[in-house]
């Protein structure tokens, strides 16, 4: 899991966390919309 470039790890982690945040917001938006529409 450890890469040869320690400088590249934080960028990858930041990008992954950003994608996870967007995904969570997207799922929450769908859940809230379906809850309100029901």
UniProtKB/Swiss-Prot annotation:
Highest taxon of the lineage: Eukaryota
SUPFAM superfamilies: Photosystem II reaction center protein L, PsbL
Keyword Coiled coil belongs to the record: no
UniProt-listed GO biological process terms: photosynthesis
TM spans (from-to): 17-37
Coarse class of the protein's main subcellular location: plastid
Membrane topology, from the record: Single-pass membrane protein
Keywords from the UniProt entry: Chloroplast, Membrane, Photosynthesis, Photosystem II, Plastid, Reaction center, Thylakoid, Transmembrane, Transmembrane helix
Presence of keyword NAD: no
Gene Ontology CC terms, in alphabetical order: chloroplast thylakoid membrane; photosystem II reaction center
Record Pfam families: PsbL
Localization of this protein: Plastid, Chloroplast thylakoid membrane
Family affiliation: Belongs to the PsbL family.
Protein purpose: One of the components of the core complex of photosystem II (PSII). PSII is a light-driven water:plastoquinone oxidoreductase that uses light energy to abstract electrons from H(2)O, generating O(2) and a proton gradient subsequently used for ATP formation. It consists of a core antenna complex that captures photons, and an electron transfer chain that converts photonic excitation into a charge separation. This subunit is found at the monomer-monomer interface and is required for correct PSII assembly and/or dimerization.
Subunit note: PSII is composed of 1 copy each of membrane proteins PsbA, PsbB, PsbC, PsbD, PsbE, PsbF, PsbH, PsbI, PsbJ, PsbK, PsbL, PsbM, PsbT, PsbX, PsbY, PsbZ, Psb30/Ycf12, at least 3 peripheral proteins of the oxygen-evolving complex and a large number of cofactors. It forms dimeric complexes.
Protein known as: Photosystem II reaction center protein L
Species whose genome carries this gene: Cyanidioschyzon merolae (strain NIES-3377 / 10D) (Unicellular red alga)
Lineage: Eukaryota, Rhodophyta, Bangiophyceae, Cyanidiales, Cyanidiaceae
